[in-house]
């Protein structure tokens, strides 16, 4: 007897943990000026992969929970709420393009690679645009920081997300191809 809900929840937890580990231990901090650092990491690859395999709800929650916990435990507590929202949107964007626009589940191998690449690039573009805006609004309206500081932080965030997007998309496509014939042939979640 197979319980798909338990399998789905287990995979979501695994992807959240992988995103957490990538942020916590595999990030590269780059000085960006103004006393700020940009964080470059491949954790988005696991959010993308979760959204492709598990669909919108679990994929979006995977990224939101995994990277929000990483922020909290790494000492970036005030970054956790914007991280939750922006990573949730990243997962939703990837799942929407892959499953609603292109119907990834019905695609053959060659077409699936194109769909995965397009969905991953679209999701990362959404993240590069929305995350700086969310962080700017949060810093100005919730934390009460001056506009100039919030603006510099948003620019820093946009650059970090754009640079992180490239290896994340590449890794997500390769990982999807690797698990396509194992996990995906055994379990259909979407």
Predicted regions and their residues:
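Loop-helix junctions at membrane interfaces
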Residues: 1-190
